[in-house]
């Protein structure tokens, strides 16, 4: 490949056309869009893009990695247990750790999934077993976190050298927690911009 030609290479039979791209805006959501995959493709093709680089995207999309990084720099966060077994073979060991370290209720999340897909709230052992099975359908790495009672707020940070925070939004879920349905299918869920905190 000629590294001097940047862009998307369209190959049709023996014909090759390079389609130049000035800059890409990766507006993909979730897996392959926010996990470093598309960013890596842009870098391989020599296409400039906006947003986080490959490492930042991959590390921040993976909830367990994010917890480890946050812990290393002293960010306070919910206590957690990580289950990284490829299947449910270590389920009993995970449940024992959860019951010893966290208690109930807990949130169970696939480590690499977005939009709260595969996320459950477990109030007891039976619900935890079901939640682990559901989360493992989305990713073999599963994060189990203690429940923290409080108001849920969100804030985006934009920019690299001179980052700026967006206004804070408070999430008012129309369900017990802000799951996939509450986010995308329930019109009763709301986000209040600049709430009274």
Residue ranges and their predicted role:
Residues 14-18, 57-151:
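Active-site nucleotide/adenylate-binding loops and adjacent lid/helix of ATP-dependent enzymes
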Residues 35-37, 117-118, 154:
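Short glycine-/acidic-enriched loop or helix-start segments at secondary-structure transitions
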Residues 47, 113, 183-185:
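Short connector loops/turns at beta-strand edges and beta->alpha or beta->beta junctions
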Residues 1-55, 59-65, 72, 83-96:
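ATP-binding N-terminal substructure of ATP-dependent carboxylate-amine bond-forming enzymes
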Residues 48-52, 77, 165:
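Short hydrophobic/aromatic-enriched beta-strand-loop microsegments
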Residues 120-197:
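Phosphate-binding site of ATP-dependent enzymes
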């Amino acid at each position: 490949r000629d590294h001097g030609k940047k862009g998307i290479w369209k190959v049709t039979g023996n014909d090759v056309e390079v389609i130049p791209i000035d800059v890409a805006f990766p507006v993909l959501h979730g897996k392959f869009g926010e996990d470093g995959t598309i960013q890596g493709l842009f870098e391989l093709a020599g296409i400039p893009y906006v947003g986080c680089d490959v490492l930042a995207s991959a590390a921040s999309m993976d909830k367990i990695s994010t917890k480890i990084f946050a812990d290393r720099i002293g960010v306070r966060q919910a206590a957690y247990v990580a289950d990284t077994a490829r299947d449910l073979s270590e389920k009993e060991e995970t449940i024992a750790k959860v019951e010893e370290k966290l208690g109930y209720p807990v949130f169970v999340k696939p480590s690499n999934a977005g939009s709260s897909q595969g996320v459950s709230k477990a109030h007891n052992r039976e619900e935890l077993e079901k939640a682990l099975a559901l989360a493992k359908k989305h990713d073999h790495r599963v994060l189990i976190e203690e429940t923290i009672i409080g108001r849920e707020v969100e804030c985006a940070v934009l920019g690299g050298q001179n980052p700026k925070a967006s206004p804070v939004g408070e999430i008012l879920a129309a369900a017990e927690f802000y799951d996939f349905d509450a986010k995308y299918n329930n019109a009763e869920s709301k986000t209040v911009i600049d709430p009274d905190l």
